[in-house]
């Protein structure tokens, strides 16, 4: 079973790249906004939205982990490396997928802020993520989180056997996904 965790700052390309990697391995993609966008229209964008989203995600992970015939899952998310609770979140995911048959791949994406700001308003992103359609709010969230949190790791900070960090600033989603697919196939 392949568990592919794709993380990085907002608008780095996690969902688009994750879709292509998912197609290559015939794995479903649970991108960050699937659960968030199902909740926020009803209760707003607040702490409860994130709490409920996490409950749904963990329920999905537990179901997948128990099903030995399941091929796996791709999950995309933002990891704030300066927040201990995010490290705890990763620990919980690792505890759920703790069988020897579970292969967890950690893929970190990075891109410079100007490129992420450009990607933040692409037609495809706005089509797939309703909460990003308020461009002003989305831009503010992206830039504020970049100032407030460290959304990419330091060198050697992520201590996982199957870990790849990829700067996608000047790569297309296709080029990025091909590099990730090749890396997974060699691990």
Show the residue positions of the predicted features.
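Conserved substrate/cofactor phosphate-moiety recognition/catalytic segment
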Residues: 19-65
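Hydrophobic anchor at the beta1->P-loop junction of P-loop NTPases
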Residues: 6
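Small-molecule kinase domains that catalyze NTP-dependent phosphoryl transfer to phosphate-bearing small molecules
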Residues: 122, 126-175
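The conserved Walker
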Residues: 10
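Glycine-rich phosphate-binding loop used to anchor ATP phosphates in small-molecule kinases
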Residues: 52-108
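Short, amphipathic alpha-helical "lid/cap" segments that border enzyme active or binding sites
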Residues: 57, 61, 173-181
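Conserved phosphate-donor/acceptor-positioning beta-strand/loop module used by diverse small-molecule
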Residues: 98-120, 166
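Conserved lysine of the Walker
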Residues: 14
């Amino acid at each position: 079973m392949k568990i592919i965790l794709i993380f990085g700052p907002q608008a780095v390309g996690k969902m688009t790249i994750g879709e292509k990697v998912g197609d290559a391995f015939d794995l479903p993609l649970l991108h960050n906004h699937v659960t968030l966008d199902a909740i926020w229209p009803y209760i707003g964008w607040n702490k409860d939205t994130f709490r409920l989203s996490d409950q749904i995600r963990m329920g999905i992970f537990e179901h997948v982990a128990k099903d030995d015939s399941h091929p796996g899952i791709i999950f995309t998310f933002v990891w704030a490396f300066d927040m201990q609770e995010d490290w705890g979140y990763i620990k919980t995911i690792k505890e759920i997928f703790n069988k020897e048959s579970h292969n967890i791949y950690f893929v970190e994406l990075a891109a410079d802020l100007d490129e992420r700001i450009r990607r933040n308003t692409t037609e495809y992103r706005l089509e797939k993520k309703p909460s990003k359609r308020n461009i002003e709010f989305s831009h503010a969230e992206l830039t504020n989180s970049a100032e407030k949190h460290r959304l990419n790791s330091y060198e050697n900070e992520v201590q996982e056997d199957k870990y790849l960090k990829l700067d996608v600033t000047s790569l297309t989603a296709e080029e990025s996904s091909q590099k990730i697919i090749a890396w997974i196939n060699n691990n």
